[in-house]
Regions:
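Helix-turn-helix
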Residues: 12-15, 19-58, 62
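Hydrophobic alpha-helical connector segments
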Residues: 62, 73-105, 157-161, 187
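Amphipathic alpha-helical interface segments
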Residues: 19, 23, 96, 164-171
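Amphipathic, non-transmembrane alpha-helical scaffold segments
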Residues: 9, 17, 60, 64, ...
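Hydrophobic/aromatic-rich alpha-helical bundle segments in the mid-to-C-terminal region
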Residues: 103-118, 122-126, 130-133, 141-192, ...
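Short alpha-helical functional segments enriched in proximate histidine and acidic residues
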Residues: 23, 70, 74, 78, ...
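Short coil/turn segments at alpha/beta junctions that flank glycine-rich nucleotide-binding fingerprints
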Residues: 26-30, 82, 146-147
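N-terminal intrinsically disordered/low-complexity leader segments
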Residues: 1-11, 201
């Protein structure tokens, strides 16, 4: 195992990325300063430029892309391991999403993106689509091809499903505790409602 300067530098950079990802996820781009990240890691804020010369924006883009890549890989594994039926696949999607810190896509679009360069905002928008919406859309289109779901606006349904699952994070702990069901069970029920509809059968 390497213990030289390069390994130490790599470990330090990884700590910076981990701290930045956590803080940006909690507070958004505007709510985090380089001093906050440096304090979390235990270094001077000027030392951050050694690891990310582009400063706060470069750091935000890098850790957001890293977070999204983890979603893309995780959703792919979840769907692949769920079997061929759409309900099981979407339940697996919900389980993966709820196992990760919430993305807060609405805040990202309306608060974070306007504060960074347009090219970087577009880059993150494309990454978010590829990592979050495209995998769910692929599940629904596969189900359409097998005759499990009707040929509707599946892209819209994918976005709605993602938003529904993310909204489960907003349910207060007290409500979850008194409801007698977990967030996972609540997300599964939302998916079942989406698939089965509210009309009586």
């Amino acid at each position: 195992m390497a213990h030289g300067p390069a390994a130490v530098d790599s470990d330090a950079r990884e700590r910076v990325l981990d701290a930045a990802e956590r803080l940006f996820a909690e507070r958004g781009y505007v709510g985090v300063t380089l001093r906050d990240i440096a304090a979390e890691v235990g270094i001077r804020h000027t030392s951050l430029y050694h690891h990310v010369p582009g400063g706060k924006e470069e750091l935000f883009v890098e850790v957001t892309e890293r977070h999204l890549a983890r979603h893309r890989e995780g959703l792919g594994r979840a769907v692949a391991g769920a079997g061929p039926e759409v309900r099981a696949q979407l339940h697996a999607v919900a389980d993966w999403l709820l196992s990760q810190p919430p993305m807060d896509i609405v805040r990202m679009i309306y608060s974070d993106m306007p504060k960074i360069a347009p090219a970087q905002a577009e880059r993150l928008s494309m990454a978010a689509f590829a990592s979050l919406l495209a995998p769910i859309d692929a599940v629904l289109r596969g189900a359409e091809g097998r005759g499990e779901v009707a040929p509707r606006n599946l892209g819209l349904a994918a976005g709605g499903l993602l938003a529904m699952v993310e909204s489960v994070y907003a349910i207060p702990e007290g409500v979850i505790a008194t409801s007698g069901r977990s967030r996972r069970e609540a997300a599964h029920e939302l998916i079942d409602i989406l698939l089965d509809g509210l009309y009586p059968r």
